[in-house]
């Protein structure tokens, strides 16, 4: 409407008679555009872009990539340093009697550090937080996307978990992804003198939580110590299986038969044995992560080679390379003749991790493949005096032309009756 009004005024001024003795009318004054702007409808100023609310590190990510700041390995708060030492003696006990005080925080942006987590969870009394730790890559210092926050008591941690889980993180539009940490921050897995009385529970519906799984078994078996639903590292959602630990072997044996086919939420559970894997005469040291993965030794952090098993003979190097290409730059692809397997080596470790997670159990060629970590050609194993190659201290493996592969771990999605878990082992069962 404003444009129409301006145009009509212009036409009206042109229709006025012009006197011959007078000079032509002067050109429009320079203020004319301002006059037109006055006739335009007023609009509110454009708000600043959303990303401006983020810390400066988000605006200059490349600087962080090439010159990461020196992050502290562990963040503790001096005003209750004494409390941390007073409670150290009870950490192991608390982790197994329901008094866990540490929560896992996932889906962290790379700029979210210990100070960010502390300010996010600290209420009026900062002394409720004992320690904060963001897990970082040991080579470049960048965040791995998750961390741990330890509180003074289980009640405080439980309150934070219930109140914050699913709410929006400060300065983002992303919700908090929280869960109980299986063990206190920085602690190794507790070694039990007796056998590990755990069972595998499969076919869980997506809504089954640790608490629901625990209640389902503890109502009938009082010796149940803990229950864990395995979560996807990227989405934080259930992978559809979990584990229940018992304190009594007889109750564990009964549960294997009595609970098989019993419904938990909306689905019937499938029960199987879960046996802790031991190698070289000692129990593997490590911690359960709430996302369902096992903390691994630092020696393989640079490994970028993936072993691909179950290849049919018609698959070529190019066929194998194609599905992996979308995850990042590839160094090489090799398929040993007549072995039914192959090796894909990436440039970057994160690309290899994503490919392993996404492509395991998919079809390449005509068969479903199984993926596991291989070994870079540069990291050949030393040989003993008999010519045998030593394998990784916690993975058995075989080698071919400098490449190696860990003993593949069947995916529960591929073998419905095979109870496997990163910390547990089992015997593969035949499926029709």
UniProtKB/Swiss-Prot annotation:
Subcellular locations according to the entry: Nucleus; Cytoplasmic granule
Tissue: Expressed in leaves, stems, flowers, and seedlings.
Compositionally biased region (Pro residues): 22-32
Organism this protein belongs to: Arabidopsis thaliana (Mouse-ear cress)
Stretches assigned to the RRM domain: 101-183, 197-276, 304-376
Region (Disordered): 1-55, 271-293
Major subcellular site: nucleus
GO terms for cellular component: cytoplasmic stress granule; nucleus
Protein name per Swiss-Prot or TrEMBL: Polyadenylate-binding protein RBP47C
Known partners and oligomeric status: Interacts with the poly(A) tail of mRNA in nucleus.
CDD domains xrefs: RRM1_SECp43_like, RRM2_SECp43_like, RRM3_NGR1_NAM8_like
Domain of life, source organism: Eukaryota
InterPro entries referenced in this protein's UniProt entry, alphabetically: Nucleotide-bd_a/b_plait_sf, RBD_domain_sf, RBM42_RBP45_47-like, RRM_dom
Pfam family for this entry, one: RRM_1
UniProt keyword terms in alphabetical order: mRNA processing, Nucleus, Repeat, RNA-binding
A GO BP entry: cellular response to heat
SUPFAM superfamilies in the record: RNA-binding domain, RBD (SSF54928)
Biased composition (Polar residues): 277-286
Function statement: Heterogeneous nuclear ribonucleoprotein (hnRNP)-protein binding the poly(A) tail of mRNA and probably involved in some steps of pre-mRNA maturation.
């Amino acid at each position: 409407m404003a444009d129409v009004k301006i145009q009509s005024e212009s036409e009206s001024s042109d229709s006025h008679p012009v006197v011959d003795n007078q000079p032509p009318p002067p050109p429009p004054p320079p203020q004319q555009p301002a006059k037109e702007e006055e006739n335009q409808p007023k609009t509110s100023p454009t708000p600043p872009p959303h990303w401006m609310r983020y810390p400066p590190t988000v605006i200059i990510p490349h600087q962080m990539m090439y010159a990461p700041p020196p992050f502290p390995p562990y963040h503790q708060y001096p005003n209750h340093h004494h409390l941390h030492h007073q409670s150290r003696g009870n950490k192991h006990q608390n982790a197994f009697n329901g008094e866990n005080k540490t929560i896992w925080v996932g889906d962290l942006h790379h700029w979210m550090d210990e100070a960010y987590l502390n300010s996010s969870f600290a209420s009026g009394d900062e002394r409720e937080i004992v320690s904060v730790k963001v897990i970082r890559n040991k080579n470049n210092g960048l965040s791995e996307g998750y961390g741990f926050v330890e509180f003074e008591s289980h009640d405080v941690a439980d309150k934070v978990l219930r109140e914050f889980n699913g709410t929006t993180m400060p300065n983002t539009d992303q919700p908090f992804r929280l869960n109980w940490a299986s063990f206190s921050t920085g602690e190794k897995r507790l070694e039990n003198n007796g056998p590990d009385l755990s069972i595998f529970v499969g076919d869980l519906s997506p809504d089954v939580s640790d608490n629901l799984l625990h209640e389902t078994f503890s109502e009938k078996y009082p010796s149940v110590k803990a229950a864990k639903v395995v979560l996807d590292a990227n989405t934080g959602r259930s992978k559809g299986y979990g584990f229940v630990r018992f304190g009594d072997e007889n109750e564990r044996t009964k549960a294997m038969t009595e609970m098989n086919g019993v419904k938990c939420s909306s689905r019937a559970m499938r029960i199987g044995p879960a046996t802790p894997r031991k190698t070289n005469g000692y129990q593997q040291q490590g911690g359960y992560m709430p996302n369902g993965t096992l903390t691994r030794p630092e020696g393989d952090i640079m490994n970028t080679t993936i072993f691909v098993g179950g290849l049919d003979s018609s698959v070529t190097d190019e066929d194998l390379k194609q599905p992996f290409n979308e995850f990042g730059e590839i160094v090489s692809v090799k398929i040993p003749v007549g072995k039914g397997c192959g090796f894909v080596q990436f440039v970057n470790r994160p690309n290899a991790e994503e490919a392993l997670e996404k492509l395991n159990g998919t079809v390449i060629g005509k068969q479903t493949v199984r993926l596991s970590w291989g070994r870079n050609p540069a990291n050949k194993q030393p040989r003993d005096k008999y010519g045998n190659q030593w394998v990784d201290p916690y993975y058995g493996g075989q080698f071919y032309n400098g490449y190696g592969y860990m003993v593949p771990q069947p995916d529960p999605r591929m073998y419905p009756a095979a109870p496997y878990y990163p910390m547990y082992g089992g015997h593969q069962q035949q499926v029709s």
